[in-house]
Amino acid sequence: TSAQALAQAGLRPEGDLADEVGVLIGTGIGGLSSLDEAARVMRAEGPDRVTPMTAVNMLPDMASGQVAIQFGLRGVNFCVVSACATGTNAVGEAAEIIKRGDAVAMVVGGTEAPVTPLALAAFHRTGSLSTRNDDPAHASRPFDRDRDGFVVGEGAGGLVLERLDFALERGATPLAEVVGYGNAADAFHVSAPEPEGRGAARSMLRAMAKAGRMSHDDFPSRSRRSGRALCVENVGWHYKAADAQADA
């Protein structure tokens, strides 16, 4: 997806420009399948049979590193890990990197490949997975009244973010603009959201403050029973607070 994003953007960083183009690919877990396989080999054949590449393949930031190597991008390079928010945070943090002047462009995205026995067992034990095995096509239904959990999937997505003047100077056609980004924590529980959703609302308000205007709602595709009501409450609190600030 990084190759597709660069091709669509028409961006081929070479020479000194490659020093100003970075990579930020987020992942929630990293190379879990490599870790799973290494554990299996060690149990069955002993530690000397574990490939030394395990140490590299399991690291979450290797996706960013491999993209940088493939395209010769020598700018800022790291990853973010923030569970279900990882991809969104990657875009936001990359935008902040550009705004503070540490890059003129960033290849940004998210990737995940957690369909392994260990991951499925772990999520199953938390009670988070859908058990609608008899109807897999409709198992993932985050906004349905009868939702019963989420479905683990694999995938990747990539974007190219650029400083606006840089994009226009080289004749690129911007598809969208990141005008505000906010981040906040509930500091409440390892998996359950804070009941009033103030952390989520606070992140929305921070994004709005940076943008100087109202932002578009982006509902997270969560299928847990408490997900939809809390998400609606977050957005409602977010707009009420914005109205209060505007009236002050």
Report each predicted region and the residues it spans:
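Short glycine/serine/threonine-biased micro-segments
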Residues: 20, 24-29, 81, 85, ...
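Generic structural signal for well-ordered, non-membrane alpha-helical segments
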Residues: 56-60, 64, 87, 91, ...
